Each structure stands twice: as C-alpha cells, then as structure tokens.
C-alpha cells in the first residue's frame, strides 16, 4: 500500500494534543489493514521524520442504543500513536 492509503487523517483532540506535548507522539486514523511496520514507513516517508515506536488501537463497530432500541451503528476505526525520535517534530501539527 502507498502511504497515502495508509494514513487516513490526523486526529486532533484534547487527548491527542496532550500526548503530543508530553510524550512526543502524534495520532493518526489509519487504514484498518495496515500494520505497525507499514505505518512507521508511511509516516517516515510522508513527513521526513524518524519514528521510534508505533502503538495501534482498534475500535470495533458497535450498535447505538437509545431507549432500549437499536437506532444506528457506530463505525469502527484504527488509530496509531506514533512516537517520534528526540528532536523530531511534524510541522503539520504545530500551532494546532
């Protein structure tokens, strides 16, 4: 897979911002079929940085229940917490 197919979009949230400042990690939504090695290579190719570690979280799809009835479906996703090498940063995330 090409790195444009692996990295879906960056995750910008309160937790992602906290992790970026404290642990020098950035968070991406990634393709559910991508593995850690492919994610590492994709981030290094796309942003020209050195990656030291990748942690992956997979959220399963679930039903949305309201008043005892199934109203809809919440889609699942896969998130990657990418740890950058000391001194590295992605300019895309600065100022967010």
From Swiss-Prot:
PROSITE patterns xrefs: RIBOSOMAL_L23
The keyword Thylakoid is assigned to this record: no
GO cellular component term of the entry, any: ribosome
Biological process annotations from GO: translation
UniProt-listed SUPFAM superfamilies: Ribosomal proteins S24e, L23 and L15e
One Pfam family matching this protein: Ribosomal_L23
GO MF annotations, alphabetized: rRNA binding; structural constituent of ribosome
Keywords, in A-Z order: Ribonucleoprotein, Ribosomal protein, RNA-binding, rRNA-binding
Similarity comment: family membership: Belongs to the universal ribosomal protein uL23 family.
The protein's assembly and partners: Part of the 50S ribosomal subunit. Contacts protein L29, and trigger factor when it is bound to the ribosome.
Described function: One of the early assembly proteins it binds 23S rRNA. One of the proteins that surrounds the polypeptide exit tunnel on the outside of the ribosome. Forms the main docking site for trigger factor binding to the ribosome.
Protein name: Large ribosomal subunit protein uL23
Gene symbol of the encoding locus: rplW
């Amino acid at each position: 897979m090409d790195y444009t197919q692996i990295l879906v979009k960056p995750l910008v949230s309160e937790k992602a911002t906290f992790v970026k400042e404290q642990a020098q990690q950035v968070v991406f939504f990634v393709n559910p079929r991508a593995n850690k090695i492919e994610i590492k290579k994709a981030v290094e190719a796309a942003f020209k940085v050195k990656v030291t570690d990748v942690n992956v979280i997979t959220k399963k799809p679930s039903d949305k229940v309201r008043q005892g009835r199934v109203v809809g479906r919440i889609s699942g996703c896969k998130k990657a917490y990418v740890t950058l090498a000391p001194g590295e940063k992605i300019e895309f995330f600065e100022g967010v």
